[in-house]
Every structure is written in C-alpha cells, then in structure tokens.
C-alpha cells in the first residue's frame, strides 16, 4: 500500500497527542488525551509513567479509528516529548520503580545546592552547556536512586533502565526490545557531553549514576525499531524520528539556518536560536543545547527556558477564577486598554533564563483600588512577552546575531493581542505559521526524512507558510517605558524573602 502519512506522537506535560500529517505537512487527523498531575509536596511535580503510556495507546487507537486510516499507509512514527522528565524502570518487568519526576519539579534543589557547593558548576557548564538546576534529568535520576530502597545496587547490576519520556515510549512500543534516546534529549540530562557526543564518566560519577542504566544515544532521524503489532491492527510501523519538544518545534518551524529562531508559548515559554555547527557558550544565562543530529552531523542551538508562561493564565482561570476559559484572555486584555502600571512576575517555581533563581516566589506590583481583573489578565499576558524580551536580549548578546524575525508557535500565540504585543515589545516581526502544531510536525518531518517520505530539508522548508505576520507598531518611548517597569518588578521580586 502507498505510504500516505507520517504519525507523530507528541507526549506533553499535561496531555498526549497523536497526529497524522500528509505529504504537504498538513494535519490529517488528531487525537488527544489528558492525564493526571501528581503533587506530593509543594514544588514537586510527578507523573505516573503507566498512565502516560495508556494515554499514548488510547490516542493512537482513537486517531486510527476516527480518521479511518489503514496502518499500512503510515510511513513511520516520529516521537516528541516533554524533555528532562525522568523515568527509571525494571528491565525485566517494564514496571517503573517510582513516578516520573517532571521537568518542572524542584524536589532535587538540595542536590543541586550540594553540587554547586562542591564546585562542579563550571565543569557541568563546559561539558553539557547547561547549568546545575533541578530542571534537568541527572539530579532526578540521582534522587530516585537515593530514595527508592535498593535502587542504586540494582542499577549497578544492570537491572534498571533510565530514560527520558522518548526512551520510555519506545521501550514500551517495541515491547522492551529497544532502549534508545536521541542527541536532543540526551543533551538535557546533565549527564551527556555535547562536544564528544557521549555519556560522560565524570558527570556520571558526580551524580553517582551507573552507566549500565543509560539508553544508547542515536541520531534524531533514523529507524530505531518497529512497533509491536497490537498497536496498529497487526501491522508493524517503524519508529524513525525523535526530538525533545522544543527542538522538534525548531525543526517544524524550518529554522534550518544559523540565526533563525522560534519561540513556543505553552505551559512554559522556550526560545531557541539555531547556531549551526558551533556550540556557542552563553555568558548571559542561556543554555547551549543540541538542536538535532541528522545524517552524521550535529547542529546546536542557544535556548532560553521560561518556566511559567501560558500557565499564568491557567492560574487566573483555575486559581483566582478571573476567567471562564483561557481563550477569554484576549478580550480581557484588550478591554483593559493598558496595564495601568500592573506587572505580574510569575515566578511560581522561581525564574528560569536568564536569571536562574529557583529561590524566589511570584509577585504582583502596581495595584490600586482601580485595578480590575482585566488589568490582571493583561499583566499576565504581557508577562510572557517581557520574559521573551529578557531571553532575546541575552541571545543577541551571546550570538552576536540581531534577530530579523521571530517564528512563534504554541497555544498562547493564537491570542492576537499577545502576538502583537510581543512584536511591539521586541521591535521585531512575529510570524505565526499556518500549521500551528509545529512540535508534532517537527517530529513527523524527522521520521519522514528517515523513511524517504520527504526527500530533504529543502522540500520541508518550502512547505512552511505564514498564517499572519505581526509588525511592530508601538512608539519606542512607550516600549522602553513598559519594559523598564518590568525590569523594576523583576528586581523587586528577586529582593523579596519569606523566612
């Protein structure tokens, strides 16, 4: 049967999605399933790995049934995933020995403090391009081995496996036959040397993580293995692409040339700039990471990770009951007229790039008796744009490249007010693509290249198209005044302490 589609599995922080893409890179079908969040203690975030797999299996079945697609028409599967989230499981039974510790979780912050006190920061920075932070997988694995009885001894015997979510999905989809990850996910573990492209013995010793439990690191676009037949009605489908969610979005946005950048506005906000074959060491609080590895060549990116973006609107909706639904935020923000001097610094789990302060809480500034919920909503939406400017300033400083345009994706960019305000605050055009699901599309492209469904990156780049281009329209003095207010709010937030 002729291959007509590529399937992307997009395993995110709050839901799993399965999506079909045709040869034109258009969405041909989608299914989505949410799963539970576990909060054992303040600042801790965990997932049940079995529940994640159930959500993935369910979406695949729903997608095939709803789209009435014959599995033989699927050329391959691309996987993209929430990065850094760590799973440890028993190789014999396939059962996790603890919950998955999520990228947002701060439960390893004490381990990070100890590593910093021991003087490991520069070594980690030089080898991994990362900072010592609870965000990354390495300290999560150490925490599991430290806290689950007998785990480290079992890991040393080769009885346990570690993986980021991509590894966990592939292990299960192949029936335990394949234990792999790709360069992008490995580069987020704090255990992988992004220059030698190997798991690093010194980093593993620092974390006391046995090498026997680590997955094999492969390229981002190749056939890793075949699915078991029960998931695709008796057919085996090749799993042929892997990328962490933000790198997948960079690929899906066709940012193939050095200096091209994208920003994804989701739960958090993640801005990546392609730096080509050069791993640019950041002096301004950004991360150096692997963009992808294809055809024997690795390319790099600078990244600014903002921990709280769209979730600040969710907080207004669910926590403060100011909104009926998140999509109402555009109307509320426009109705406010301006922010009336109100700033929200959404440091609910500290601040990420370029500040990297896990010890601070969020704050609201500039309240008066005249402050309305519309002002709150506008300040929340504006906070995404201000944080993005913080990151862009650092990115241009590190790279020496002045950004010509920003390709934007993610749920929040559907908000026209947000997109226009972002362009105004950056003084850079913001481009929203026709296909909004760029993360899943990037994974599909990687799998499609490996299976010959698409011939080249040049073919992919021609498919990328703009839905709407937002041009800067704000006076420069107003832009600078608004941003100065934000900077004051951040400075005040970092100076506030609760004993």
Swiss-Prot record:
- Which ranges form a coiled coil? none
- What is the E.C. number? 2.7.1.30
This chain's function reads: Key enzyme in the regulation of glycerol uptake and metabolism. Catalyzes the phosphorylation of glycerol to yield sn-glycerol 3-phosphate.
Give the source's domain of life in one word: Bacteria
Q: Which NCBIfam families match?
A: glycerol_kin, PRK00047.1
Instruction: Name the gene that codes for it.
Output: glpK
Q: What protein name is recorded for this chain?
A: Glycerol kinase
PANTHER family per the record?
GLYCEROL KINASE, SUGAR KINASE
Similarity section: Belongs to the FGGY kinase family.
Q: How is its activity regulated?
A: Inhibited by fructose 1,6-bisphosphate (FBP).
| Pathway the protein acts in | Polyol metabolism; glycerol degradation via glycerol kinase pathway; sn-glycerol 3-phosphate from glycerol: step 1/1
Gene Ontology biological process = glycerol catabolic process; glycerol metabolic process; glycerol-3-phosphate metabolic process
Query: What positions does the entry give for ADP binding?
Result: 13, 17, 267, 310, 411, 415
Natural source organism:
Xanthomonas axonopodis pv. citri (strain 306)
Task: Look up keyword 4Fe-4S and say if it applies.
Answer: no
Chain sites annotated for binding ATP: 13-15, 267, 310, 314, 411
Question: Which InterPro entries does the record cross-reference, listed alphabetically?
Answer: ATPase_NBD (IPR043129), Carb_kinase_FGGY (IPR000577), Carb_kinase_FGGY_CS (IPR018483), FGGY_C (IPR018485), FGGY_N (IPR018484), Glycerol_kin (IPR005999)
**Binding-site positions, glycerol:** 83-84, 135, 245-246
Query: Which CDD domains does the record match to this protein?
Result: FGGY_EcGK_like (cd07786)
Catalytic activity reported: glycerol + ATP = sn-glycerol 3-phosphate + ADP + H(+)
List the Gene Ontology MF annotations in alphabetical order. ATP binding; glycerol kinase activity
């Amino acid at each position: 049967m002729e291959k007509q589609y590529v399937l992307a599995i997009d395993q995110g922080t709050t839901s799993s999605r399965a999506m079909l893409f045709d040869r034109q890179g258009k969405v041909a079908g989608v299914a989505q399933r949410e799963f539970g969040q576990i909060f054992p203690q303040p600042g801790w975030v965990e997932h049940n790995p079995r529940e994640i797999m159930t959500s993935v299996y369910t979406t695949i079945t729903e997608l095939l049934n709803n789209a009435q697609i014959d599995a033989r028409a699927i050329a391959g599967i691309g996987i993209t995933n929430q990065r850094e989230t760590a799973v440890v499981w028993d190789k014999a039974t396939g059962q996790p020995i603890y919950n998955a510790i999520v990228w947002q979780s701060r439960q390893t912050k004490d381990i990070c403090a100890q590593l910093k006190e021991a003087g490991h920061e520069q070594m980690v920075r030089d080898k991994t391009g990362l900072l010592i932070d609870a965000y990354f997988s390495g300290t999560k694995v150490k925490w599991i081995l430290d806290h689950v009885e007998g785990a480290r001894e079992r890991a040393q015997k080769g009885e346990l496996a570690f993986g980021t979510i991509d590894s966990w999905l592939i292990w299960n989809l192949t029936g335990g036959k394949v234990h792999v990850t790709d360069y992008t996910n490995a580069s987020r573990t704090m255990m992988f040397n992004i220059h030698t492209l190997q798991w690093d013995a010194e980093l593993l010793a620092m974390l006391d993580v046995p090498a026997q439990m680590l997955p094999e690191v492969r390229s981002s676009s190749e056939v890793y293995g075949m699915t078991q037949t029960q998931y695709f009605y008796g057919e085996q489908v090749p799993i042929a692409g892997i990328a962490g969610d933000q790198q997948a979005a960079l690929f899906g946005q066709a940012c193939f040339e050095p200096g091209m950048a994208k920003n994804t506005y989701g739960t958090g906000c993640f801005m990546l700039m392609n730096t080509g074959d050069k791993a640019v060491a950041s002096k301004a609080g950004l991360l150096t990471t692997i963009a992808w590895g294809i055809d024997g060549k690795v390319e790099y990116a600078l990244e600014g990770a903002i921990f709280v973006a769209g979730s600040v609107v969710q907080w207004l909706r669910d926590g403060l009951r100011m909104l009926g639904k998140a999509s109402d935020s555009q109307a509320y923000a426009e109705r406010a007229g301006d922010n009336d001097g109100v700033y929200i610094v959404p440091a609910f789990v500290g601040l990420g790039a370029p500040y990297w302060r896990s010890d601070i809480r969020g704050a609201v500034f500039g309240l008066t008796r005249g402050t309305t919920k519309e002002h709150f909503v506008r300040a929340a939406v504006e906070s995404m744009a201000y944080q993005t400017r913080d990151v862009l300033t650092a990115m241009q400083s590190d790279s020496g490249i002045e950004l010509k345009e920003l390709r934007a994706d993610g749920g929040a960019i559907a908000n026209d007010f947000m997109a226009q305000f972002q362009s105004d605050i950056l003084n850079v055009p913001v481009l929203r693509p026709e296909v909004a699901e760029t993360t899943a599309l990037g994974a599909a492209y990687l799998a499609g290249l490996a299976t010959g469904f698409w011939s080249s990156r040049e073919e992919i780049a021609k498919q990328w198209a703009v839905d709407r281009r937002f041009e800067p329209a704000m006076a420069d003095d107003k832009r600078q005044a608004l941003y100065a207010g934000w900077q004051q709010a951040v400075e005040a937030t970092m100076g506030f302490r609760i004993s």
